[in-house]
Amino acid sequence: MVTLGLDASTTCVGYAFTENERILDMGFIDIKKQKTPKEKVFKVLEILNNISYINNIDKINIEDNLSGFAGGRTSQQVIVKLAKFNAILCFVLEDTFEIEVKNINPMTARKCVFGKARIKGIKAKEFVKMKVEQMYDTSKWCKETTRGNWDKRNIDMYDGLVMSLYEKKA
């Protein structure tokens, strides 16, 4: 059973394909250059459609886009823009693949995958990076910047992986 996990923002979409907790493929899609939500969604679809595992997916999990804004540091405009993009992306994915897209709270997914959602004093992104790298050798999928540094967009890929590994305990 192949699961596609996604972490979508309006500039970058992290994705991961997993089967039985094994990573098949993962990466991130830079959509900064696309102007409209429609262009961004179709860019994501174009890239995903070129990945061989796309025809085998039977689950799609996407990070719930409004969960991370409890701190109040994000403007309403940004939240609305992200919600609009996520809604369009989910609709197009469901329509294209005829699979229900599940919106998953990132804290719930982390707790399920790692046994805990966070560690006090460690930022969520650092926690995810640390835990994913303890579980897997991700070196073949991680990208570097032109200066040879770890590309921070890899974290979106890691978040996509957490979504892909999430399995609701019935």
Annotated model-derived regions:
Residues 1-170:
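Phosphate- and other anionic-substrate recognition elements at nucleic-acid/protein interfaces
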